[in-house]
Structures are given as C-alpha cells and as structure tokens.
C-alpha cells in the first residue's frame, strides 16, 4: 500500500475526531485494496488500509493526537490506543486480528513490536517534509471529481469500490460542508482523488465518459478547479465592489479631462475660466491639485460635459495663458472615474466620522458653557 499523500486541504482534526472532520479521506494500495494475495481476507485488507492511512503521509502530517503518541516511545503506539479510533474499532476489537493483518501488508510502512502490542511507522520511511514544493507536486496528480449523489448518503466504502478499477489511486478526499440546520458535516458530492503518478492521473482524465449511478461525472485537475473558484470569487468581489461604489446617482456625460496646465494654475482659476465660457455650467468638483499638469472637471448636471465640449474649438481652451486640451470621459473610462469619485467621497466621510469619534466627552462638554451659566442666561434659577 502506498503512503497517504499530504492533503492540500488538510484539516486540524485529530484521528479520534475524524468522523466529524470536514473531509473524509481513505488510502488505497497501489494495486488497490482488493488485489491482495489470496491469504488476505476482506477484513484484513480493510484493516491494513485503515492502519496505513493512520500512519500515512496525509493523516500523520496533521494528526496532533497521533503525533503526540509517536513522540512518547520511539514512534511506537500501543494497539490499545489505536483501537480507540472508531473506524479501526468498527473493523475489529481483537488486537491479534489487527496485528496479524498488518503483518500481511506488502507495503512495509508499519512495523510490529516484538511483543506484538505496539505498531509504528517504519524508521526508514520518514514523513516527507511538508512544504510548498511537496504541495505543488501532489496537486499535479490530484483530480477533482463531482457527481456522487450526496442526497443518497454516499459512503467512503462505495467510493473505494467505484475507483477500484483505476490504476494506482493513493488517496481519496470526500469534500464536506457544515450544515447549519443539522449542525453536521455533509458530503458535497465531490472528491479529490490523488494518483500515484501524473501519467495515471492523465489516463483517468482521458476517459471519454465516466458516470456514477447514471449521472455523468465532472472531472478536472485540482489546480484547474482551484483556479476556476478563484476566478468566480474575483468576479463576485468585483460585483460587490461595484455595488459598494454605485455610481447611478452621479450625472453622466458630465466629466471632462483637461491636460496642459502650468504649475501655478489653481482650481479657482480653472472654475472661473469655465464660467466665463458659459456661466450656466455648474461645476460640482475639480479633481486637480496645484502643480499637476492634468485634472478632471466634474459638472453637476447630466450632459453638461458635452455642452462644455461643444463650446470649444478643436477641444482647446485657454487657461493661465496655456492651451489646455479637453476630452470628454465616456464609457468605461467615465465609469472608472465616477467610481473613484464615490470612493473618495466615502473616504472623506469615514475620515470625518473618525475625527468626530475621536473627541472625548470631556472635550465636547468643555466647548459648551457650564449648566449653571446656561440657566442664568435663560433667566433660570442660577443661585
């Protein structure tokens, strides 16, 4: 049996809690659990698979409880302790059955102590270093598969049986979510399947059609699945951002970009020049700072920018003895500018609120006349 691959989506649950963990995993042998020699029973094959899952790469890397047990006695873990794990206990509570089974494994991952009371991961099979390189390597041979009828209560045993014909699957992860109504982790209907090699992974994806209980399965590389999810999140975030900075209330066709200012031009000069051109044009705001060479004028009414442009010759206007080039903002450029306007407005509002909140009650009271003075001023009983 191959070692369990380090799961990219590993949880912090201990082995004792694995029945409630957000994900359920299972290891299979390279030849699959069913392709054992004739002298290994189905029970023994299941026992071997479960024990090698406990001591395998994926589980051992995240299982704090088992790590603690391993640290106590040169890696040895009493079989009695392992039998407190529900899944192993459900297979057999007989220590002899457990030990006899693991001794029949061809994988060589687990050692049995001389007194047959303890098990440990073989010292010559150290746990691989858990780093970014390892994670990427595993992602490169892991497939996302969806369509396993969660409403029918699909079990890991059914998934193991389904994937049995495919070559050298080393790990299966049942993806789960927390259901608030039942307060339980329920199967999503999708799994991550890790193959021993990239070639086996590619062969699995090349199969034309693959179904489960009459439903075609969706298959893609885990990396591709994650990238698609990232793209979906970015799209949702962008929509949230657009909703947050809604520009519907701002006038359209009212923003004009001006370029060519000298360093001494002020906003007041720009506004005065525009009003001299047409005093009916109401300027809402000028996005410009002195010494800038360009800026944007936002008018207060719809299409006021268009009206302003119609009064220019060749899109030019003279400001501070400089020939300034004007350009009406339209389409995406206008939307982007108006979103910036809303962001700036919100930032100024938040800064103002923060300043107001920063005032102490004592400070606010000190700015007002004492209560006795107010009474006297109103003709009240001050004495």
From Swiss-Prot:
GO terms of biological process kind: positive regulation of translation; tRNA processing
UniProt entry tagged with the keyword DNA-binding: yes
Annotated GO CC locations: cytoplasmic stress granule; cytosol; nucleus; ribonucleoprotein complex
PROSITE patterns noted in UniProt: HTH_LA (PS50961), RRM (PS50102), XRRM (PS51939)
InterPro entries registered for this protein in UniProt: La_dom_prot, La_HTH, La_xRRM, Lupus_La, Nucleotide-bd_a/b_plait_sf, RBD_domain_sf, RRM_dom, WH-like_DNA-bd_sf
Keyword set, alphabetical order: Cytoplasm, DNA-binding, Nucleus, RNA-binding
GO molecular function term, any single one: mRNA binding
Subcellular location: Nucleus; Cytoplasm
Domain named RRM: residues: 141-228
Domain HTH La-type RNA-binding: 37-129
Chain intervals for the UniProt region annotation (Disordered): 1-43, 343-383
Segments of skewed composition (Acidic residues): 15-33
Principal subcellular localisation of the protein: nucleus
Gene3D superfamilies: 3.30.70.330, Winged helix-like DNA-binding domain superfamily/Winged helix DNA-binding domain (1.10.10.10)
Domain xRRM: 249-368
Function (record text): May be involved in transcription termination by RNA polymerase III. Binds RNA and DNA. Binds to the 3' end of the minus strand of Sindbis virus RNA. This may be significant for Sindbis virus RNA replication.
Protein name: La protein homolog
Organism of this sequence: Aedes albopictus
Lineage: Eukaryota, Metazoa, Ecdysozoa, Arthropoda, Hexapoda
């Amino acid at each position: 049996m191959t070692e369990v691959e380090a799961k990219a989506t590993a949880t912090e649950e201990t082995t004792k809690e694995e029945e409630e963990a957000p994900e359920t995993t299972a290891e299979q042998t390279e030849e699959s659990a069913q392709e054992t020699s004739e002298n290994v029973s189905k029970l023994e094959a299941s026992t071997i698979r479960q024990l090698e899952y406990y001591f395998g790469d994926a589980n051992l890397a995240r299982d704090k409880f088992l790590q603690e047990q391993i640290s106590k006695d040169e890696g040895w873990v009493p079989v009695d302790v392992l039998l407190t794990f529900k899944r192993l206990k459900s297979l057999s509570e007989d220590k002899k059955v457990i030990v006899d089974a693991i001794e029949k494994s061809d994988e060589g991952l687990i050692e049995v102590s001389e007194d047959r009371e303890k098990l440990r991961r073989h010292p010559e099979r150290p746990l691989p270093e858990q780093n970014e390189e390892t994670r990427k390597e595993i992602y490169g041979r892991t497939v996302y598969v969806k369509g396993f009828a969660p409403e029918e209560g699909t079990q890991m045993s059914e998934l193991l049986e389904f994937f049995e014909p495919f070559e050298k699957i080393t790990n299966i992860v049942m993806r789960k979510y927390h259901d608030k109504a039942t307060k339980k982790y329920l199967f999503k209907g999708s799994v991550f399947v890790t193959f021993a090699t990239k070639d086996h992974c590619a062969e699995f994806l090349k199969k034309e059609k693959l179904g489960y209980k009459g439903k075609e399965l969706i298959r893609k590389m885990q990396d591709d699945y994650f990238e698609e999810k990232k793209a979906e999140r970015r799209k949702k975030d962008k929509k949230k951002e657009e909703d947050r900075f809604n520009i519907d209330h701002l006038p359209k066709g009212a923003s004009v970009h001006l370029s060519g200012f000298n360093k001494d031009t002020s906003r007041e000069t720009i506004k005065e020049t525009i009003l001299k051109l047409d005093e009916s044009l109401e300027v809402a705001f000028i996005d410009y700072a002195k010494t800038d060479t360009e800026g944007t004028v936002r008018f207060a009414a719809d299409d006021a920018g268009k009206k302003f442009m119609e009064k220019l010759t060749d899109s030019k206007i003279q400001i501070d003895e400089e020939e300034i080039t004007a350009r009406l903002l339209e389409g995406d450029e206008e939307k982007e500018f108006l979103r910036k306007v809303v962001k700036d407005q919100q930032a100024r509002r938040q800064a103002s609120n923060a300043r107001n909140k920063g005032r102490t009650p004592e400070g606010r009271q000190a700015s007002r006349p004492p209560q006795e003075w107010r009474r006297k001023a109103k003709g009240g009983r001050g004495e």
